[in-house]
Amino acid sequence: MQLLTIGINHHTAPVALRERVAFPLEQIKPALSTFKDIFLGRTARTAPEAAILSTCNRTELYCATDDHAAREAAIHWLSEYHNIAIDELAPHVYALPQSEAVRHAFRVASGLDSMVLGETQIVGQMKDAVRTATEAGALGTYLNQLFQRTFAVAKEVRTTTEIGAQSVSMAAAAVRLAQRIFDKVSNQRVLFIGAGEMIELCATHFAAQQPRELVVANRTAERGQRLAESYNGRAIPLSELPTRMHEFDIIVSCTASTLPIIGLGAVERAVKARRHRPIFMVDLAVPRDIEPEVGKLEDVFLYTVDDLGAIVREGNASRQAAVAQAETIIETRVQNFMQWLDARSIVPVIRHMHTQADALRRAEVDKAQKMLARGDDPAAVLEALSQALTNKLIHGPTHALNRASSENRDQLIELMGGFYKHAHPSSER
């Protein structure tokens, strides 16, 4: 089995493409099923192992397969699944085989490949991806081992380096941007759309600035109310958003919607009702919650996850020593994992050798039992049994030696000498 990771992320593709390749949670299990079917319909002897990691900043497919054309097949599957032309998608896709796939998984979980260097949210997202793949019956020995090692490496990196120290989160970056637009956030009304982990982080940072009002709009009213109350705010129904948007100076949105929930027309009406007082909008969702055309309106300052990334990266340079330490740890653990993977590759060979030897043993034991049943001397039967086993067990190695070319024979002799604990002929005196 070969490991392979294909994907796109914030390094290789803009948000406009990433949102088209994203997998909503409810689509991941069916997607894994179709992916496995594609490979079983090809030359693969067994169903591939697979897991899909889909976040705001990346969509990645981790797989283990015996199909040597897996790279091309996986990229075409991703293209067809999302109805994106292969010529449009392929330039943004990375395909990482074997040790590169292992190294990438370790770096992602450790926060080295994140927009926010050292962020911890990605570990939880990877664990969710593993859980979903397990429930879909798509995980096996290879990916299970890869992800268990991945989480162990991430823990080691975070506990032995300063990779997460002094990091500037996306939430903190949103506050910094708001402070560039408004002199004081404390004078502004803030609306959060959604009630997930990212919105909660943003609410924490904005609440620290003591805004005039903090409001949450969420599809699930109870969850929105609970989040609002924890910051001394209030909740409104999501359905009221089009008619209430003009009330807010700062709007931060991050939902799991597959389509925009804030359109150009609604924002145009809000700007008009505000008499062109500026609105600061942050869209942290992928796919995006706010139609990109909104950013072209005067008096609207719209920022996406990619825009916030520039601010986040300003704080990354100071932690390069921690990055170097983390990379050293990861490289060692990659080598350890590849040793395990190499050992796994010989398991089928060993199993075949054992099966073949056992078949020979049973055949000779059957012969011996028949000889004993007809009254043959037990000592002679045992001698015949041992001779037959010896001859048949060494037939394969001796046949290989006899057929080997002169340049390969010395290597075979050395290997077999180790197997049978015999010295190499040239070492005898």
Swiss-Prot record:
Biological or metabolic pathway of the protein: Porphyrin-containing compound metabolism; protoporphyrin-IX biosynthesis; 5-aminolevulinate from L-glutamyl-tRNA(Glu): step 1/2
Presence of the UniProt keyword Lipoprotein in the record: no
Keyword Protein biosynthesis found: no
Enzyme class: oxidoreductase
Gene3D superfamilies on file: Glutamyl-tRNA reductase, N-terminal domain, NAD(P)-binding Rossmann-like Domain
Record's keyword terms, sorted: NADP, Oxidoreductase, Porphyrin biosynthesis
Residues annotated as binding NADP(+): G194, A195, G196, E197, M198, I199
A Pfam family that the UniProt record links to this protein: GlutR_dimer
Annotated PROSITE patterns: GLUTR
Record-listed substrate binding positions: T55, C56, N57, R58, S114, E119, T120, Q121, Q125
InterPro entries, per database record: 4pyrrol_synth_GluRdtase, 4pyrrol_synth_GluRdtase_dimer, 4pyrrol_synth_GluRdtase_N, GluRdtase_CS, GluRdtase_dimer_dom_sf, GluRdtase_N_sf, NAD(P)-bd_dom_sf, Shikm_DH/Glu-tRNA_Rdtase
Residues under site feature: Important for activity: H104
Record GO biological process: protoporphyrinogen IX biosynthetic process from glutamate
UniProt catalytic activity: (S)-4-amino-5-oxopentanoate + tRNA(Glu) + NADP(+) = L-glutamyl-tRNA(Glu) + NADPH + H(+)
Subunit description: Homodimer.
Family label: Belongs to the glutamyl-tRNA reductase family.
Job of this protein: Catalyzes the NADPH-dependent reduction of glutamyl-tRNA(Glu) to glutamate 1-semialdehyde (GSA).
Miscellaneous field: During catalysis, the active site Cys acts as a nucleophile attacking the alpha-carbonyl group of tRNA-bound glutamate with the formation of a thioester intermediate between enzyme and glutamate, and the concomitant release of tRNA(Glu). The thioester intermediate is finally reduced by direct hydride transfer from NADPH, to form the product GSA.
Protein name: Glutamyl-tRNA reductase
Species of the source: Paraburkholderia phymatum (strain DSM 17167 / CIP 108236 / LMG 21445 / STM815) (Burkholderia phymatum)
Lineage: Bacteria, Pseudomonadati, Pseudomonadota, Betaproteobacteria, Burkholderiales
